[in-house]
């Protein structure tokens, strides 16, 4: 494992070791307090462009499940079809793993998807810093390449456009009530929960104009990045609210 340093935008440094893909990276440093579910969190489109810190101390001990897709073409054990987080930061990475459904280690998965991973970080202290100062930009720098400093400029970047579907996708077609789901970075399990409730889900791109479509309810998914970049979606929602009394549900 190579020595690395996490440098926050205020100059605070945390030292650790690389266990994923060996490449420097920069991005927003955020934290996640879940005790399990790192495969789901890493594939959550909401984490696009972010360095995800896990506060739970031991990570990797149950490996990574396979990318298996159901009849609805949704991944069974992930929230999307790839890792969206730019990096993962943990306190203690377990090289050994055991789970009936595991097919590879977390490190193997990260390397295959070209995603850096850092272990040996005091993640709870890091979380305290983030809690006090809010989301901060950070850089993961390899100590043997001190001049290879990554940069991340999010000015004008529309992460929602990067993660949203590009065409209409229908699930449970012909089931009954129709729900239009605006994909700003929807997780697979949100779609699955809607389908399990016996509705037809019509998944549309984040900026799609659905106001002339026939449907019974509107569902707004959450997603990554700055919501100010999603003015097109806001305009369509406003038109829908002005012209119809159909129910609207938002989720975070």
List PLM regions with ranges:
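RNA-binding accessory domains that recognize and position tRNA/RNA substrates
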Residues: 1-208, 227, 235
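Short, histidine-centered active-site or binding-site loop motifs used for metal coordination
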Residues: 92, 221-222
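Generic beta-strand/beta-sheet core signal
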Residues: 182, 204, 220-221, 251
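Short acidic/histidine-rich motifs immediately flanking catalytic phosphotransfer sites
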Residues: 213-218
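Cysteine-nucleophile active-site neighborhood
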Residues: 222-252
């Amino acid at each position: 494992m190579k020595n690395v340093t996490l440098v926050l935008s205020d100059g605070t440094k945390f030292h650790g070791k690389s266990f994923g893909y060996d490449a420097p990276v920069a991005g927003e440093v955020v934290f996640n307090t879940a005790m399990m579910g790192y495969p789901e969190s890493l594939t959550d489109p909401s984490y696009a462009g972010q360095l995800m810190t896990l506060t739970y101390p031991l990570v990797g001990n149950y490996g990574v499940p396979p990318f298996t897709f159901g009849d609805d073409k949704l991944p069974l054990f992930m929230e999307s079809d790839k890792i969206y987080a730019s990096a993962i930061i943990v306190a203690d990475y377990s090289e050994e793993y055991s789970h009936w459904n595991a097919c590879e280690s977390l490190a193997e998965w990260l390397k295959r998807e070209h995603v850096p991973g850092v272990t040996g970080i005091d993640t709870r202290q890091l979380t305290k810093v983030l809690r006090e100062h809010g989301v901060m930009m950070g850089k993961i720098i390899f100590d043997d390449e001190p001049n290879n400093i990554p940069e991340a400029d999010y000015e004008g970047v529309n992460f929602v456009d990067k993660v949203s579907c590009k065409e209409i996708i229908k699930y449970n077609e012909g089931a009954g009530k129709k729900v239009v789901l605006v994909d700003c970075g929807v997780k697979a399990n949100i779609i699955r929960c809607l389908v399990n409730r016996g509705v037809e889900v019509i998944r549309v791109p984040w900026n799609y104009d659905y106001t002339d479509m026939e449907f019974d309810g509107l569902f707004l998914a959450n997603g990554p990045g700055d919501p100010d970049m999603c003015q097109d979606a806001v305009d369509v929602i406003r038109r829908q609210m002005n012209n119809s009394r159909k129910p609207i549900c938002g989720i975070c």
